């Protein structure tokens, strides 16, 4: 298994997709809305991906809830992370967050999808890229809700990915469109944004982490996703994290400062990433596969899902029915809240 995660073109694999998936550097596939028509088609696409690859790949998606939910029709309408604490008492917020983590993960596992890149652990809502994807502006509240969400994901059989280390919440720029810079003192980032990552690592609740394509100017001129300081010195050595480190998508503008696609891939792997995402740019992905030295990434097998239930079994279960009802209701309440309704 190799360290490259990439995407496929449409609802089913074409000849080029199949050729790419056989490459020994490929270790994963990430799915997008363009890959989804309905649940039966999605399940068949995942089957095709499994059949086309030499080894079992890590199949992933961003199914956070709120505005980041790639699969909608036939799946529960998941609330944005902010909704849990914003609209409920603390005990109810924690209960619903646990059910939200379980439901999201269980619905994906029933499609034979290994991981959804969640939860978002960024603090605060002012960032254009993050906004309602953050659990809360208070680090302690965000930690409590995140722990419940993680407990739910783990109980379904899915590994969790905390993002975007060391924290994307304080920058207004969107790293999909530009390279954001965070000029705050390191002490502030450590005391505020990093607190949640540190606590969850100490409690061994994070299986993987995705760093931010953000330059923290007081620490390193490189984005955190390509920074040995953040990934090796801080995350591995200081915090003792021994899980998987993903790069965020190397096609994002936030990664462009690291050079060409092969240069970005090399920089992120050398900085300490275990798996690199190259999405929505097939030419860039192929150039990485053509130019990257052979790398094995067998540790990625830790990310395979542990569920063994079918979609029918899930939808017939009492827990799914109750969770679906509660989370759909919370999504509707959150939308009404954003629209200014009582």
Swiss-Prot record:
The record marks 174 as: Important for catalytic activity. Pathway: Cell wall biogenesis; peptidoglycan recycling. GO terms for cellular component: cytoplasm. Gene3D superfamilies: Glycoside hydrolase, family 3, N-terminal domain. It is found in: Cytoplasm. InterPro entries: Beta_hexosaminidase_bac, Glyco_hydro_3_AS, Glyco_hydro_3_N, Glyco_hydro_3_N_sf, Glycoside_hydrolase_SF, NagZ_Beta-hexosaminidase. SUPFAM superfamilies: (Trans)glycosidases. It catalyses: Hydrolysis of terminal non-reducing N-acetyl-D-hexosamine residues in N-acetyl-beta-D-hexosaminides. The active site is at residues 176, 248. It holds the Pfam family Glyco_hydro_3. Substrate binds at residues 62, 70, 133, 163-164. One of its GO terms (biological process) is carbohydrate metabolic process. GO terms for molecular function: beta-N-acetylhexosaminidase activity. It is an enzyme of class 3 (hydrolase). The keyword Cytoplasm applies. PROSITE patterns: GLYCOSYL_HYDROL_F3. Transmembrane segments: none annotated. Disulfide bonds: none annotated. Its EC number is 3.2.1.52. The keyword Cell wall biogenesis/degradation applies. NCBIfam families: PRK05337.1. HAMAP family: NagZ (MF_00364). Plays a role in peptidoglycan recycling by cleaving the terminal beta-1,4-linked N-acetylglucosamine (GlcNAc) from peptide-linked peptidoglycan fragments, giving rise to free GlcNAc, anhydro-N-acetylmuramic acid and anhydro-N-acetylmuramic acid-linked peptides. PANTHER family: BETA-HEXOSAMINIDASE (PTHR30480:SF13), BETA-HEXOSAMINIDASE-RELATED (PTHR30480). Belongs to the glycosyl hydrolase 3 family. NagZ subfamily. This is Beta-hexosaminidase. The lineage of its organism: Bacteria, Pseudomonadati, Pseudomonadota, Gammaproteobacteria, Enterobacterales.
